[in-house]
């Protein structure tokens, strides 16, 4: 046996992904045709345990495994007796992204990505399988960026994209971020009066939150806004749309995205009491 090759050194432990071994048998400098080669393995299943060389002296077998671990394949010929160990390969479990679940940074809750986003909200993706070394990529960082080493995703704008993780053994897995129903953004330039806040939202083709409940639901999903890197304020009071009665009274309701503290039907719309928090 003068030549030994494996087409790769790692494979997925799914019983399907195969490593192909090629050996060449020669005698007196010439290819040896019809020579029987016996293969053995320490892990997995070989396509055949014995094969005869072709007219060029080559023989190929493939190896699969349903179990993870390292495998050493040996080849031997009968005349003269020769045992030769081939390249060691390793089978890894299939790479996945935690069954499509995310971990919300602000709450620690695990599950599906909420369909209403807090802009600059962050979630952690967790990879399983492969060789344990992962690199993350976003197909559209303007919609959602991802930390290449940790898998932490930052949601930036309303849209859809995919996050891909690649393991050190060259497996890939993809997490799809679907279009949300809406995204809630905070204009952090400062507190403004109600009408200014309303116009800020209209200018970005959004609107003020329809109610205290809409912001409470956002808080329940994402936790306090300042749990995220983008927000450092100790208080982010948000205007909500006036009801018809509010308009008569010149007041509106507010809700704090950090402290909660709902103020219902009592905040003077003429004062710079809250931020323009917009739903788009």
UniProtKB/Swiss-Prot annotation:
Source domain of life: Bacteria
InterPro entries: Big_1_dom, Big_2, C-type_lectin-like/link_sf, CTDL_fold, Ig-like_fold, Intimin_C, Invasin/intimin_cell_adhesion
Big-1 domain residues: 1-92
Keywords: Cell outer membrane, Disulfide bond, Membrane, Virulence
Cystine bridges: 201-278
Main location: membrane
Record's keyword annotation contains rRNA processing: no
Gene3D superfamilies the record matches: 2.60.40.1080, Immunoglobulins, Mannose-Binding Protein A, subunit A
Domain BIG2: 127-173
Subcellular location: Cell outer membrane
One GO cellular component, as annotated: cell outer membrane
Pfam families, per database record: Big_1 (PF02369), Big_2 (PF02368), Intimin_C (PF07979)
Family: Belongs to the intimin/invasin family.
Cited function: An inverse autotransporter.
Protein name per its UniProtKB record: Intimin
Annotated organism of origin: Hafnia alvei
Lineage: Bacteria, Pseudomonadati, Pseudomonadota, Gammaproteobacteria, Enterobacterales
